[in-house]
Amino acid sequence: MPNNFRLAKVSSLLKKEITLILQNDLENDLIRDYFVNISKIDLSGDLQHCKIYITSTAKETVRKEIVANLNTAKSFIRNNLGKRIEMRRVPEIIFKEDIVLDKGLSVLKLLDELKNKHQDKNYEDKDANS
């Protein structure tokens, strides 16, 4: 089992190379039309399996379609990875949507709503006391 340094190094290399493949080699209009970013890579300890989390500026339905297209093209991407990097075995890859950004935005929205309600209540209290 590789150490954490090796996992981090291989993950970083995979992220860099897959990003280049998505930008330059993959001919998919949907992926090219929207900003697609690899936010995180989870690589198994034996370097055999890789989950790639992506974010995009697209709407939720389009993001799901982008993930489906990437999973359809994963053999092409994996094949290109094998040509670009020296590994005994290129890991099996699966693309997933990273929903952390959406969750963060909804938390910020809730906080803004609470702040506005609190400000409105303070304003009403001041009017009542005047």
UniProtKB/Swiss-Prot annotation:
Signal peptide: none annotated. Monomer. Binds 30S ribosomal subunits, but not 50S ribosomal subunits or 70S ribosomes. Pfam families: RBFA. It is found in: Cytoplasm. It comes from the Bacteria. One of its GO terms (molecular function) is ribosomal small subunit binding. InterPro entries: KH_dom-like_a/b, RbfA, RbfA_dom_sf, Ribosome-bd_factorA_CS. The keyword Cytoplasm applies. Keywords: Cytoplasm, Ribosome biogenesis. Belongs to the RbfA family. GO terms for cellular component: cytosol. PANTHER family: RIBOSOME-BINDING FACTOR A, CHLOROPLASTIC-RELATED. The lineage of its organism: Bacteria, Bacillati, Cyanobacteriota, Cyanophyceae, Synechococcales. This is Ribosome-binding factor A. GO terms for biological process: maturation of SSU-rRNA. One of several proteins that assist in the late maturation steps of the functional core of the 30S ribosomal subunit. Associates with free 30S ribosomal subunits (but not with 30S subunits that are part of 70S ribosomes or polysomes). Required for efficient processing of 16S rRNA. May interact with the 5'-terminal helix region of 16S rRNA. It comes from Prochlorococcus marinus (strain MIT 9312).
